[in-house]
Amino acid sequence: MARARLAGVRDWAASAKLASAGKPGQRVIDAEWVQLNLARVHAKAEFLKLLNWRVAAGGSVGPADASVTKVFGTEFAVEAYRLLMEVLGAGAVVRSGSAGEVLAGRIERAHRAALILTFGGGTNEVQRDIIAAAALGLSIRRR
């Protein structure tokens, strides 16, 4: 996940004010749920970075580790962009260049692109079968 996108949402939330929900005039970033969404995205992004470094470094990596990284990473990307879009509100889905758009629609475009990652490079269902067989010693389901 691009750190710039998380930083962009954080910066937007630090400068944007709530209009009606919560406390009108309060900065968006001061809402507890916004802080939780941003913290979740940051923490999982850091975990994914460590997971990728572990797989890239080799060493004691098992045969299912690349599959684990792929499944976690792609599903996290979808979740992360959904959480960031919640922070941005309705403006997150407004077309770039239109009145009311937020951050030029980049987060919504990234969310749509992240959905493709769940089947590009091997569907997550197939990756789970690899994890089941290689990491857990389970039999692979016939499809």
Which residues does each PLM region occupy?
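Alpha-helical interface subdomain recognition
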Residues: 1-143
